Swiss-Prot record:
Composition skew (Basic and acidic residues), residue ranges: 47-57, 70-106, 273-312
Protein name: Bromodomain-containing protein 7
Biological process according to GO: negative regulation of DNA-templated transcription; negative regulation of G1/S transition of mitotic cell cycle; regulation of transcription by RNA polymerase II; transcription initiation-coupled chromatin remodeling; Wnt signaling pathway
Coiled coil (UniProt feature): 536-567
Gene3D superfamilies named among the record's database cross-references: Bromodomain-like
One of the record's GO cellular component terms: chromosome
Predominant place of localization: nucleus
Domain of life: Eukaryota
Length: 651
């Protein structure tokens, strides 16, 4: 066997010296948790220590072999001492390695600062803002996030300006967008979810009004409105109240507000508020219960209880007000003859248009109900009817004959470029009708010679004389002779009228017989038109004012017809607004009617029945027949206009 070579002393710790110890990093993220990361893998560290242990075991085996070979050496105590020394040396080496590793970890560990990082600061500020928000604001923000998810293109995120959409401010008077709604939520301008719902509807309807139905903005607004109404429906809001904590808090805060209001208005408000709080606690307990049916039943019971208590409170308040009035206020019985027909549930009514009577079909003042009165504004489509346009295939276009003048024998005689019938059919049409139907007067002799001199006219007259055997010239002579006689007759009539007007004296200086003659003369000069006679100057002024108002109304109607009959531009869906002339005429009519109404009593303008009908008061039929006067019936004979002179007191 060959001789074993001993390892050199420098080779014993070669692996331990050149293998670098792994670096460890200590990271602190947010809280107090510490994670350790090492540059070397854990397997590498374990392999390092395993190699050391194997190396020590290998030494022990060698020592055992040596001991077996040194059995002849006497003295077991010496062997024990050697073993103890070696074991102590091993322990010291291990302690030294562990101390060096701890020092390396301390050198590589980062310095931990006491200042918190930036992210926890921002998160804490956001939490503070969330804590400061009311439950209603949190609920509205939650709904806004759901609504904005339905607008992926962000069409409604920011306000629309006239630079983006021309004429937007003229058409849309109340703009709305998501950013404005968020600002309102931040400023706590919304008092309920219904106000947010109304603004959302306004935003979608504005986009549908300004844009045409075929645009992407119109379709996006319609889709957003459909999905948003589902999000803002009562069922979805109730489910949110059961699933989200701050929605339940929103319900509690509403009840607390209602309780404080009722406590301030009534005498026993404290008990009522405690009852409200108990009901709120019961409802919160019901919301926590797992069964949905029990929740609905509890909510229904609480609502019924709240309504009944509210009715009792209102009844007590009414009784107390009636007692405090000292007999001025009394309870009206239900079976009274007068009542409001258009009364709303909240007690309000509407004022209708003043009209004296209700005409029947066939009467002169009857106004039939039209479709525009019963239907509202068009939600989609255009505001004008489609104009009629004849199809080009239905129009017959014959060939066009050409004339180049002299020396054009070999030129083409007709042009069939735009013709849709053959030449034979065109000749048949020309032979039947003589000329083109669109231009019937182009071949007229007089229009053809309109710009010519006298000589062509003489030639044309002679040609017509030949055709009519002299009848054309005789007709021209008769026409020339009749014209001077008519002119002389009209001149004599004008001079006679001027003489009569200058010779007549003013009507104030004439007696009754001369006034009758003057009236008869006026009737003659007005060609038989009856002249209206006034009893006083005030009546004449009043009638002139009425005539002026009638003229203004006609002008206003003409201006409106002109505006509404014009075709609007294709980029506008809405109708054009009233012009300045229409506004001015309407203001003049209003002022004239106001002046006329100030000069008469209210009974001359409208009847008692008309006022009561406008207020919605129903009156029994016999009383109604005796109280109103029909102001719309036409008279057979012309009446003289009478003006009621009223004093300053209106009597």
């Amino acid at each position: 066997m060959g001789k074993k070579h001993k390892k050199h002393k420098s080779d014993k710790h070669l692996y331990e010296e050149y293998v670098e110890k792994p670096l460890k990093l200590v990271l602190k993220v947010g809280g107090n948790e510490v994670t350790e990361l090492s540059t070397g893998s854990s397997g590498h560290d374990s392999s390092l220590f395993e190699d050391k242990n194997d190396h020590d075991k290998h030494k022990d085996r060698k020592r055992k072999k040596r001991k077996k070979g040194e059995k002849q050496i006497p003295g077991e105590e010496k062997g024990r001492k050697r073993r103890r020394v070696k074991e102590d040396k091993k322990k010291r080496d291990r302690d030294r390695v562990e101390n060096e590793a701890e020092k390396d970890l301390q050198c590589h560990a980062p310095v931990r600062l006491d200042l918190p990082p930036e992210k926890p600061l921002t998160s804490s500020l956001a939490k503070q803002e969330e804590v400061e928000q009311t439950p209603l604001q949190e609920a509205l923000n939650q709904l806004m996030r759901q609504l904005q998810r339905k607008d992926p293109s962000a069409f409604f995120s920011f306000p629309v300006t006239d630079f983006i959409a021309p004429g937007y401010s003229m058409i849309i008077k109340h703009p709305m967008d998501f950013s404005t709604m968020k600002e309102k939520i931040k400023n706590n301008d919304y008092q309920s979810i219904e106000e947010l719902k109304d603004n959302f509807k306004l935003m979608c309807t504005n986009a549908m009004i300004y844009n045409k139905p075929e645009t992407i903005y119109y379709k996006a607004a319609k889709k957003l409105l459909h999905s948003g109404m589902k999000i803002l429906s009562q069922e979805r809001i109730q489910s949110l109240k059961q699933s989200i904590d701050f929605m339940a808090d929103l319900q509690k805060t509403r009840k607390q507000k209602d309780g404080t209001d009722t406590s301030q208005s009534g005498e026993d408000g404290g008990c009522w508020q405690r009852e409200r709080e108990d009901s709120g606690d019961a409802e919160a307990h019901a919301s926590k219960s797992p069964s949905k049916e029990n929740k609905k039943k509890d909510n229904d019971m609480l609502e019924d209880k709240f309504k009944s208590n509210n009715l009792e409170r209102e009844q007590e308040q009414l009784d107390r007000i009636v007692k405090e009035s000292g007999g001025k206020l009394t309870r009206r019985l239900v079976n009274s003859q007068c009542e409001f027909e258009r009364r709303k549930p909240d007690g309000t009514t509407t004022l209708g248009l003043l009209h004296p009577v209700d005409p029947i079909v066939g009467e002169p003042g009857y106004c039939p109900v039209r479709l525009g009165m019963t239907t509202g504004r068009l939600q989609s489509g255009v505001n004008t009817l489609q104009g009629f346009k004849e199809d080009k295939r239905n129009k017959v276009t014959p060939v066009l004959y050409l004339n180049y003048g002299p020396y054009s024998s070999y030129a083409p005689h007709y042009d069939s470029t735009f013709a849709n019938i053959s030449k034979d059919d065109s000749d048949l049409i020309y032979s039947t009708y003589g000329e083109d139907s669109d231009l019937p007067s182009d071949f007229s002799i007089h229009e053809f010679l309109a710009t010519c001199q006298d000589y062509p006219y003489v030639m044309a007259d002679s040609l017509l004389d030949v055709l009519t055997k002299g009848g054309h010239s005789r007709t021209l002579q008769e026409m020339e002779m009749s014209l001077p006689e008519d002119e002389g007759h009209t001149r004599t009539l004008d001079t006679a009228k001027e003489m009569e007007i200058t010779e007549v004296e003013p009507p104030g200086r004439l007696d009754s017989s001369t006034q009758d003659r003057l009236i008869a003369l006026k009737a003659v000069t007005n060609f038989g038109v009856p002249v209206e006679v006034f009893d006083s100057e005030e009546a004449e002024i009043f009638q002139k004012k009425l005539d002026e108002t009638t003229r203004l109304l006609r002008e206003l109607q003409e201006a409106q017809n002109e505006r509404l009959s014009t075709r609007p531009p294709p980029n506008m869906i809405c109708l054009l607004g009233p012009s300045y002339r229409e506004m001015h005429l309407a203001e003049q009519v209003t002022n004239n009617l106001k002046e006329l109404a100030q000069q008469v009593t209210p009974g001359d303008i409208v009847s008692t029945y008309g006022v009561r009908k406008a207020m919605g008061i129903s009156i029994p039929s016999p009383v109604m027949e005796n109280n109103f006067v029909d102001l719309t019936e036409d008279t057979e004979e012309p009446k003289k206009t009478d003006v009621a002179e009223c004093g300053p007191g209106g009597s």
